[in-house]
Amino acid sequence: MGDRIVVMKDGIIQQVDTPQNLYDMPCNMFVAGFIGSPQMNFLDGTLIKKGELYGIDLGGDVIPLPKEKTADGKLDAYVGKKVKMGIRPEDIDDEPEFMAKHTDCQLDAQVEVSEMMGAEIYLYLEYKGNKMTARVAPTSKARNGDTVRVAFDPHKVHLFDIETEQTILN
């Protein structure tokens, strides 16, 4: 049995890697959306920079990017440009301890559907025209029609070039 997976699109190899690397470090939006269930969420944003700090402006809500992920300066070419932000469902949560840990990475979203999966709940959310899925604890109080505040783990944010769909930050 092999230890690498080949991800292809239209007969063209996109990435060859271990399952974990495909999941954690996808080379483009296709691979990011292909690996994982539910698939990665993609949100429209604009990359901004204030001093040495980068963030993604999602239309008023700004998700700051950790310094250790941006220190190489590779994002400078994208400042002021539209990007796609990727975040996996398990890296979005409404649990109080998670919220307290990520106070600067929060936004309000509308719960379209709350789906009990047994050991977890999938929240299908709408945020400023973007659809998102959050994988939360079965103790979540969020229900259909609610506006819920959720937080992101900024260390798990991915950025993609909006034109080429190639990864610019994992």
Where are these regions (language model features)?
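Glycine/charge-rich catalytic "coupling/switch" loops of P-loop NTPases
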Residues: 53-55, 59-110, 131, 141-170
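Long, well-ordered amphipathic alpha-helical subdomains in the mid-to-C-terminal portions
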Residues: 104-113, 117-124
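Short, conserved beta-turn/loop elements at beta-strand boundaries and strand-helix junctions
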Residues: 49-53, 114-121, 162
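Internal alpha/beta loop-helix hairpins
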Residues: 1-62
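Conserved positions in beta-strands of structured domains
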Residues: 14, 20, 46-48, 90, ...
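Short, structured coil segments at secondary-structure junctions
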Residues: 1, 127-128
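Hydrophobic packing within well-folded, soluble alpha/beta domains
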Residues: 5-13, 22, 109, 125, ...
